[in-house]
Structure formats: C-alpha cells, structure tokens
C-alpha cells in the first residue's frame, strides 16, 4: 500500500544494471528451441517459458500468462472471465502490462518512490500471472507460494523488481506465483446492487488467479494441495479477505499477512460510502452527460466510455476528508464477497486448524507522513511543532470525532516533553502506524489464535544498508519485502554479507511455513525457536541481523488503546455532546497546566542553587 506514484524504472536496479544482469546471468540463458523443461501444457494451451539465472543456479520462469479475458470496453468494472484457450504455443517469456493506475510524481527520480512505480506499460488489459519453478522441474509435488502485491488498492504490479521470484524459488526449491489484479476505480468502484459495477472485482481477479493455480500449478511441479497465500499491505488485507470469504477459502491452505489486515480502518468501506464515491467520480468526469439524473446503467455506460486516465486523474478527489493512509476505491462490504464487516467475520469465524504467519515492520507509519502530514518531508528532519502534531492527528485518524482525536493526543503525547519536535515526529508516526497496521494485525492475531488457528507473529526491525529514505523514517512500511524475496543474494545490489545471510534466514522461515505451517526448521532443532502466538502469552519474535529474540505483547499498551479503550469511549459517549464539550474543556485546561508546569520546571532546573546544602 503506498500513496500516490511515477514510472518506469526501479532505481535500486538501474537500466545499466538490468542490462548487466541480463548479459551475465540475470536474464535469460540461450536455450535450445524446444527445451522440454520450458514447455508446459495448461488448460488454456501450451506455454513456452525461459530459463533465468539466480546467483546459485537456474530457475524456470513463465511470465505474462493470461488467466482472464481482457477486462476492457464493456468488461470494465465487471467480474473477470476465465481466459479462453489459445492456439499453438504462447510465449510466456516477458512480463505483460501493468493494470492502469495512479503514478507517484511527488519525488521524481527518487529511488524510494520509483521502485514502487509501474515498470511496464499501463493498460486495462493486464490480467496476467507469473510462475517461477525450480530448474529442472521438481519430480515430486512442491509447495506453492502465491504473492499478492500491496499498493493501497490503487497501485502495484507483479512485475516490480522487488517481487522477482527467482531468488526465493532457487534458494528454497518452491514454486512461486504472482498475479496482477485491477486497482483503483477499475478494480473497486462499486454501485452496490448494480450488475454493471458490483464492486470487489479486483478481489475476484485474485480469486480467479487462485482458481488457475489449483487447475494448473501441477504442470509446473507445484502441489495444489499445499498453497500458501502471502501478501503485504493491501496485499495482506486481500489475503485476509480471502480467509473470510468461503468461495476463496478452499483455494489455499496457509496464509501470510505482512503489514496489513482486513480489519484495518482503511481496508473496506460500506455500501453507502462506496456508492457516494462512485457517483462523485462520475460527476467529476461528466457522467451522466447533461448532469444529474440517470440510472446506474446509464452512469456506468458513461464511465466505460471515458478514457482510463480521466478516471485516474480524478479518483483522489472522492475521499471524504484530507487524510493519510486512506484510499479512494477499496473493497466494499457487499454482502457477497464479504458477507459482513471483516471485524464481524473475524469474531464469528471458525479458524480451527488454520495456519497463519503475521507481522509488521518497526516504523509502519513513517512512510505515509511524507504524503500529506503537516511539516513532513523526506528532504529534512521533519521536526514538527505541537500545532503540526495536533493537525497531523486529524489527518492520521481522519474519521475521528473531536473526542477521539483528543484521546489520541492524550495517549501519544510525552507529557514530560510535550513540545519536543523529535518526540512529536515519532509520536505521529506511531499514531499512523499503530492505528492502521500494528493494532489491526495484533487484533487479528489474537482473535485467530483464540479461535483455534496456529499463529506465528514477528516484528521486522532491520533497516537495509541500501535504503534511500532518511534515517528518521527508521524501518518503513514495505521494506521487509526485498529480504523475503531474497534480493540481497544478488551481489551487484551491494547489500552486506550479513544482510545476505539474513535474507537466506528469512526465506527459510517463509519456505518452512509454506511446507509445514511452522517457520522453524525441523533440520536444525538447536536453532532459536519461534514460538506460536497465543491470546494469552502473545509471543512474537524480532527479525533483525541478530538471532531470534522472543518478546511478548506486540505494542500491547498502544493496541489496548486502539482496540479496547477507544471503541468503548466512543460507544459510551455517542450521544453525550455536552459531556464531550465539558471533557474537552477540562482536557485543554489540564493540557495547558502540564505545558506550563514543564516550562516552570525547566526554568527552575536552570537556576543557580545553593551548592552547600
């Protein structure tokens, strides 16, 4: 999930470097015209792949495999249709187009943003998937990992360099699949009740890809009875929604949710808000022609006639208020794919026997602050004033009432240093990260564990030596992915030897989980053990260059505030407008008193005092 985006290269893998990788082993090797390892028969027809070199050996890659009919023209906004068979042999040797999306131009040329931007042409004809498999093909069925990218449901692509599957496939001998799915209005615009734009078609794209995996992955050496679905940010929220949707649940067997959860406050909207956003976008692009009026069919027909870029150019204007970590078109609680809110489905679900791995990074909120929080920029230390902190809380928790915002301020202020710019910067980062990622993930882990699931939890704490974001941002959202996918194994990317070893360890944890539902290595019982997360002990591990360290209570105090106290406070004061006004007045008096006391104490501390007492 990432705020606004700009294309076309991944700065960490610059064009000269990509050419070098291609020439000396990062690209395809010369193969005989019909290498049997690179010819596969799937239900749609025959495929020809290519052999790629990873640092320790070759893998087979089948890139740009169509799994759906192009969702263009009259198919815009509709559920995907399976790809019809093709004649002859289809070349699956290059990534295909990226789904049409907003492109980030806030920091042009900066590698920290460019690495997430589209690296292929934008098109609505984008429903393709990719398969990496060991070379030669496994002789016995091999566990399968299926990746869902993040990007706030408005951006992302399976072709990004950071999602290169060759390293994990070669190192661990697993089959890896990734797919494109529609994002933004193309994937999530919803007019609930309308057959023309039902919503959630991006999730249906993902489900169709999972069905394709069940039908075809055995041809690549994969085991369709051992499929692990994993994703990050909006990809993790998507994984969670498939867990909560019965037609999806039978298509995979284990789940990994990295820095995201379906119960996050940004991850879904209700039917009323979904319709409001859809009709507002329509008005912004001049639909229906002639102004107000018209039915859903006419409105959708008009929207289908608009150029794709028109929809992208206006989609951010449908949000109800200024915010960070909120996205225009997201999954809708439609009564179909999601029969109820994620929170209700999690509370009511039966998760006995489910195996889940969940986690967060150390500084989940920092990335989003440079996309709209007052006083923040990647180009300075972002040392904010108290006024900017207070304003930042309102954009960081945009749906909060005045009472809720005051409670957030009270909880996150260091009252011994209420005006300290660095502490205020860290506090706002924690507000955004805890509210949107850490505490929804912790809540999900606890509920799943309490209902019989076997859960493992982590916090990723290593800041990559190659990271281009400023130091104050710490370990930002999304920057564990390069280690999970094994990019440090590529020597030309200039990671340290320690980071290479660390990446190998993480790939082993993820692959072990895909194989057995347990990240621990049964071949190394003397290694530090990763214990399951339970609702009582709440054990999780820290992932960094040091050996595993077991801890308890992932941001427990902060998450008690978000998951327990704040909902009860708001419920208890729902109709108490006068009480809220009185509480605010008392709070402001107390807050002013604390600031005054601190100033007086600092003044006193600087005075000369009797040295002979």
Curated annotation (Swiss-Prot):
It is an enzyme of class 3 (hydrolase). Residues 1-30 form the signal peptide. It comes from the Eukaryota. Glycans are attached at residues 91, 295, 380, 494. It is found in: Synapse; Secreted; Cell membrane. Keywords: Cell membrane, Disulfide bond, Glycoprotein, GPI-anchor, Hydrolase, Lipoprotein, Membrane, Neurotransmitter degradation, Secreted, Serine esterase, Signal, Synapse. It catalyses: acetylcholine + H2O = choline + acetate + H(+). GO terms for cellular component: extracellular space; plasma membrane; side of membrane; synapse. GO terms for biological process: acetylcholine catabolic process; choline metabolic process. Gene3D superfamilies: alpha/beta hydrolase. Its EC number is 3.1.1.7. It is a peripheral membrane protein. Disulfide bonds join 99-126, 287-302, 439-559. GO terms for molecular function: acetylcholinesterase activity; amyloid-beta binding. The active site is at residues 233, 364, 477. Terminates signal transduction at the neuromuscular junction by rapid hydrolysis of the acetylcholine released into the synaptic cleft. Belongs to the type-B carboxylesterase/lipase family. Interacts with PRIMA1. The interaction with PRIMA1 is required to anchor it to the basal lamina of cells and organize into tetramers. Isoform H generates GPI-anchored dimers; disulfide linked. Isoform T generates multiple structures, ranging from monomers and dimers to collagen-tailed and hydrophobic-tailed forms, in which catalytic tetramers are associated with anchoring proteins that attach them to the basal lamina or to cell membranes. This is Acetylcholinesterase. It comes from Bos taurus (Bovine). The gene is ACHE.
